[in-house]
A protein has these predicted regions:
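An N-terminal boundary/leader segment
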Residues: 1-44, 48, 262-264, 325, ...
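Residue-level signal for inorganic ion chemistry
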Residues: 27, 49, 210, 234, ...
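Glycine-rich, small-residue loops and helix-cap segments
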Residues: 16, 66, 72, 106, ...
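Structural helix-boundary/capping segments
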Residues: 33, 106, 151-156, 160-243, ...
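Short glycine/serine-rich loop/turn segments
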Residues: 65-198, 239, 353-366
Length: 422
């Protein structure tokens, strides 16, 4: 039952061959069986989930009718605590839902519970493990959401991305992760870290489910994946940080490019030109400057309740970024977005790593967002697809980057790639 896709489940519920209650109970059984190891959930109330499922069964219609959704614990829910993995907010229930959660409820979804996040969606890790090997990180900061989808606890889950917090954990856990064009999804009711780049993202096991989920969050009719979109023009973008990729990741990107070329795609090399070869430093300047100010209350009023890792790491670094440096970085980011847009005059997708390698061993850190931050700054839609395994038998992903505000087409092009990867 937990292997069914969200799209299939909605169709079955609408047809009367499946009930949401049956579906939700199946997922709850899976969670009871596995979450002592995976530790994906910080708040889960089975009775509340079943009550929502019964209400969905009694209702009619809705893009997500009866479908369980996991919600990262920096996203507000009026009927559940939103704790941000911080003692400052432990047990506190917001006054209302985040816009994305409210829109899911409007679509008759079941808000299953809250998934583990790193502290304030930053570096200090939570308890979640990688479902493929609990000795390894699931990635972060959307740790619980990625692990929950990968381990069959829910078919859909929300993440957020400031650096690489959707794409990287999705890749580490072997699921599909999608970061939309910056600004497409409302951020109302989501803990703000960096207002220039913070982006709500989605995780699922299939691109069809991502398309369904996207439509619900936008409150629009679903734009189904176009299976006849044709052969894409693909640019291999090793990016300025290619030297930080592990050998298995470099080999995967090269092998994927060869495979897609053999299947009929046009494949060319794409390299960054000056002055954008150090653009990752500008992402760091912008996020450092903004985050230390957006966390002002936590930092100044409750410093003893902020982790040392956050207080003496990102916050300390952010305090030394001058306003002049911030302005320079913002101006460069504006130019960079236009530059990246221009790359799509000649290609439809960029092929690039989702992460440096497979999920690192240990739970104290969640991996490096070095292959994600530049695209988050560019505001482009990004998709990670499971594409192989590394030397420890853990998932490897490939990242596909598309033109801003062309997300529906990007998802269809990604489906062409996925069909040949599989």
């Amino acid at each position: 039952m937990t292997e069914i896709t969200a799209l299939e489940a909605v169709a079955a519920i609408e047809a009367g061959t499946l009930t949401s209650e049956t579906l939700v109970r199946g997922y709850l059984d899976r969670i009871a069986e596995r979450d002592d190891v995976v530790k994906a959930w910080v708040h889960l109330d089975p009775d509340q989930a079943i009550a929502q499922a019964k209400a969905a069964d009694a209702a009619s219609g809705g893009l997500l009718r009866g479908i369980p959704v996991g919600v990262k614990d920096i996203i507000d829910t009026y009927d559940m605590p939103t704790g941000h993995n911080s003692p400052i907010f432990e047990g506190k229930v917001p006054f209302g839902d985040a816009a994305c959660v409210a829109l899911c409820r409007t679509a008759n979804a079941v808000i299953m519970g809250k998934t583990v996040t790193t502290e304030f969606a930053n570096r200090h890790a939570g308890a979640t493990t990688n479902p493929h090997n609990p000795a390894h990180t699931p990635g972060g900061s959307s740790s619980g959401s990625a692990a929950a989808v990968a381990d069959g606890h829910v078919p859909l889950a929300f993440g957020t991305q400031t650096g690489g917090s959707v794409i990287r954990p999705a890749a580490y856990c072997g699921v599909v992760g999608y970061k939309p064009t910056f600004g497409d999804f409302s951020r109302v009711g989501i803990k703000m870290q960096c207002h220039s780049v913070d982006t709500l993202g989605l995780m699922a096991r299939t691109l069809d489910d991502i398309a369904l989920f996207r439509a619900a969050v936008l409150k629009l009719p679903i734009v189904h994946i176009d299976r006849d979109i044709g052969r894409p023009r693909i640019g291999i973008c090793r990016s300025p940080v290619w030297d930080q990729a592990e050998p298995e990741t470099k080999a995967l990107i090269e092998a994927t490019a060869t495979l897609l070329s053999d299947k009929g795609a046009s494949v060319v090399d794409v390299a960054f030109s000056a002055p954008f070869t150090d653009i990752i430093d500008d992402h760091a300047a912008i996020t450092g400057f903004e985050s230390v100010r957006n966390y002002a209350d936590e930092r100044l009023r409750n410093p003893d309740m902020v982790s040392e890792e956050l207080m003496n790491g990102p916050m300390k670094r952010g305090l030394v970024v001058s306003f002049e440096r911030y302005v320079v970085a913002q101006r460069k980011a504006t130019a960079f977005k236009a530059y990246v847009d221009s790359l799509f005059d000649k290609v439809d997708l960029l092929l690039t790593p989702s992460a440096p390698g497979e999920a690192p061993k240990g739970l104290a850190a969640t991996g490096d967002p070095v292959f994600n931050s530049i695209w988050t700054l560019a505001g482009t839609p990004c998709v990670t697809l499971p594409a192989g395994t590394g030397p420890d038998g853990l998932p490897l992903g490939v990242q596909l980057v598309g033109l801003r505000h062309d997300d529906d087409r990007v998802l269809s092009l990604a489906a062409w790639v996925a069909a040949h990867l599989n």
